[in-house]
């Protein structure tokens, strides 16, 4: 277990969740100020380097071959496309470029191509992150050798609810990939998706599993489901805004030193809801009007919101 937070029982985490809203936000903000500048937001950019055609059946995803969505599959980007994206990310003030590929598990030849992309990203002084699916022995080490800073592999939800959403990859597969990444000396980015029909207990359980990893993730993305037509979750009810903010606050309390990122779904959030999430301890966002396959708040809108709230981009 990584630290005292890993000793939290599920009931204890649920008790934190159930605190009066003002008390919960106050506690989370106190924790946040112990480890971060409360007005600094870390900014990343997300790039889909290989889109669609994924053999997995994740119920939320437009890239699955199992679902009838309007998404058109695209091949792996070439280095010059990645270079252009890195240049734009740097110009927009991002500190990290996160590259995602719709693979179940990459071939070794794919890893070599991604390794070259990581090199291009590093040329621009950006941190690098990739999300490529499950990794085979030796692949994490190759990525680390290429200079990879972060590997994203979300747990998505609790072990108990997971089977309601995904059938082609086990929960243990995800944990095994996180272990391989950590063993290779790469920092971990891992979180979940809210609003898939899970309960508060499921959300608390997911956080408990993350807390029980040998070392806590350095980055924890909190996604709000973006229902996509043609996917099994297209009619899912959106998560209550206060429940979303509660989850951010509990995440901050359990993981004092992690970056807590507002990820997918932010485009649909009001400025007021985002401000509450920042107050609850969120301190990272994706810049740009596109994530992997869904929309995102524009960089101009984000900067205007930062100005209204007195926030600034983190220099770390």
Swiss-Prot record:
Gene3D superfamilies: Aldolase class I (3.20.20.70)
Binding site for [2Fe-2S] cluster: 98, 129, 189, 261
Record's keyword annotation contains Signal: no
Metabolic or biological pathway, per its Swiss-Prot or TrEMBL entry: Cofactor biosynthesis; biotin biosynthesis; biotin from 7,8-diaminononanoate: step 2/2
Nucleus listed as a keyword: no
Cofactor mode of binding and number, as noted: Binds 1 [4Fe-4S] cluster. The cluster is coordinated with 3 cysteines and an exchangeable S-adenosyl-L-methionine.
Cofactor: [4Fe-4S] cluster; [2Fe-2S] cluster
Keywords on record: 2Fe-2S, 4Fe-4S, Biotin biosynthesis, Iron, Iron-sulfur, Metal-binding, S-adenosyl-L-methionine, Transferase
Catalyzed reaction equations: (4R,5S)-dethiobiotin + (sulfur carrier)-SH + 2 reduced [2Fe-2S]-[ferredoxin] + 2 S-adenosyl-L-methionine = (sulfur carrier)-H + biotin + 2 5'-deoxyadenosine + 2 L-methionine + 2 oxidized [2Fe-2S]-[ferredoxin]
Record-stated family: Belongs to the radical SAM superfamily. Biotin synthase family.
UniProt-recorded name of the protein: Biotin synthase
Upper taxonomic lineage: Bacteria, Pseudomonadati, Pseudomonadota, Acidithiobacillia, Acidithiobacillales
Gene behind this protein: bioB
């Amino acid at each position: 277990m990584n630290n005292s937070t890993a000793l939290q029982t599920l009931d204890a985490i649920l008790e934190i969740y159930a605190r009066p809203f003002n008390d919960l936000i106050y506690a989370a903000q106190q924790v946040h100020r112990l480890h971060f500048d409360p007005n600094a937001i870390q900014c990343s950019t997300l790039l889909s380097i290989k889109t669609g055609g994924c053999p997995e059946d994740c119920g939320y995803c437009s890239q699955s071959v199992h679902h009838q969505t309007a998404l058109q599959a695209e091949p792996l980007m070439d280095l010059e496309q990645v270079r252009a994206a890195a240049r734009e990310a740097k110009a927009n003030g991002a500190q990290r470029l996160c590259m995602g590929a719709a693979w179940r598990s990459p071939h070794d030849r794919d890893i070599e191509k991604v390794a070259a992309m990581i090199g291009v990203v590093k040329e621009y002084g950006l941190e690098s992150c990739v999300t490529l699916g499950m990794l085979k022995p030796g692949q994490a080490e190759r990525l680390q050798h290429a200079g990879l800073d972060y590997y994203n592999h979300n747990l998505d939800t609790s072990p108990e609810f997971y089977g309601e959403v995904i059938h082609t990859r086990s929960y243990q597969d995800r944990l095994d990939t996180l272990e391989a990444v950590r063993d290779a000396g790469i920092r971990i980015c891992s979180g979940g998706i809210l609003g898939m029909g899970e309960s508060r207990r499921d959300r608390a359980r997911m956080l408990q599993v993350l807390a029980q990893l040998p070392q806590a993730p350095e980055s924890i993305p909190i996604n709000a489901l973006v229902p996509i037509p043609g996917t099994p979750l297209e009619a899912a009810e959106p998560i209550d805004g206060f429940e979303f903010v509660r989850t951010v606050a509990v995440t901050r309390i359990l993981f004092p030193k992690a970056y807590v990122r507002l990820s997918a779904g932010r485009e649909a959030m009001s400025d007021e809801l985002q401000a509450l999430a920042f107050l609850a301890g969120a301190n990272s966002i994706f810049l740009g009007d596109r994530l992997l396959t869904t929309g995102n708040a524009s960089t101009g809108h984000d900067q205007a919101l930062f100005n209204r709230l007195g926030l600034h981009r983190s220099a770390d």
